[in-house]
């Protein structure tokens, strides 16, 4: 569930905002700077990462790490005020291949609305979020239908929890279509071991971990570039 300060924002699915990629870039830089070499990739995922798709005004970021070291990662995010979401569904991502551990962080109170999803690099959970995004980017009809569904659902749902529960089933149905497209189009991630750069790899909005001197990788190595 959202923190109390997040509940005050209410539930609204709004038209696509061209500022969202820039908002992602600012947040991604903060994440890169605080995690340093712990982060392998930082990617824009979720509805705000799909041009033309209506979404809640909340930036979703996926961070891939080599190992999900909870103490280290929670400590790093704590230095910039990000809060670990404690709910069970924010600790494990169910996938067809089995559950994948994850950590999800909320921003400091009063900060720009966001969710930071931390998963193990190249895990099935990481792959599925990027596939879902790329499928909607490649299919205008699916994107527009999903956009309309979410706006209608948001207008009927009592709160963010009911909205999320009602959206879960249709999301999995859409995911089946995405998996079918991935097989037909030979979609693969640009960095996947078996993709080799061939097939329908769509370059994602992802950044490698910060490698500049001063970027932190431990609890005391925070290097801030906050605007």
Regions found by a protein language model. Give the residues of each.
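Helical scaffold of the NTase/Pol beta-like nucleotidyltransferase catalytic core
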Residues: 1-43
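Short histidine-centered catalytic/ligand-binding loop motif
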Residues: 12-18, 62-66, 131-136
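Conserved catalytic core of two-metal-ion nucleotidyltransferases
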Residues: 82-122
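Short amphipathic alpha-helices in soluble, non-transmembrane regions
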Residues: 72-81
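Active-site nucleotide-donor binding segment shared across nucleotidyl transfer reactions
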Residues: 30-72
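Short, compositionally biased low-complexity segments
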Residues: 1-8, 104, 120, 144-148
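Catalytic cores of NTP-dependent nucleotidyl/adenyl transfer enzymes across multiple folds
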Residues: 118-200, 206
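Cysteine-cluster motifs in flexible loop/terminal segments that predominantly coordinate metals
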Residues: 200-223
């Amino acid at each position: 569930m959202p923190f109390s300060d997040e509940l005050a924002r209410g539930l609204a699915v709004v038209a696509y905002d061209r500022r969202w990629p820039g908002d992602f870039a600012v947040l991604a830089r903060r994440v890169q700077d605080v995690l340093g070499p712990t982060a392998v990739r930082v990617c824009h995922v979720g509805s705000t990462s799909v041009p033309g798709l209506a979404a809640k005004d909340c930036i979703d970021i996926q961070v891939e790490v080599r190992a999900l070291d909870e103490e280290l990662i929670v400590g790093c995010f704590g230095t910039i005020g990000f809060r670990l979401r404690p709910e069970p569904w924010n600790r494990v991502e169910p996938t067809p291949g089995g559950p994948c551990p994850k950590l999800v962080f909320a921003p400091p109170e009063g900060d720009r609305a966001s969710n930071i999803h931390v998963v193990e690099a190249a895990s099935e959970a990481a792959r599925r979020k990027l596939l879902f995004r790329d499928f909607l980017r490649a299919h205008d009809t699916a994107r527009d239908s999903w956009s309309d569904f979410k706006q209608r659902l948001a207008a009927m749902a009592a709160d963010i929890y009911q909205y999320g529960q009602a959206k879960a089933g249709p999301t999995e149905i859409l995911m089946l279509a995405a998996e079918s497209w991935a097989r037909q189009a030979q979609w693969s991630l640009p960095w996947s071991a078996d993709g080799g750069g061939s097939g329908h790899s769509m370059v994602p909005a992802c950044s490698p971990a910060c490698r500049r001197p001063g970027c932190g990788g431990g609890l005391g190595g925070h290097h801030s570039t906050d605007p």
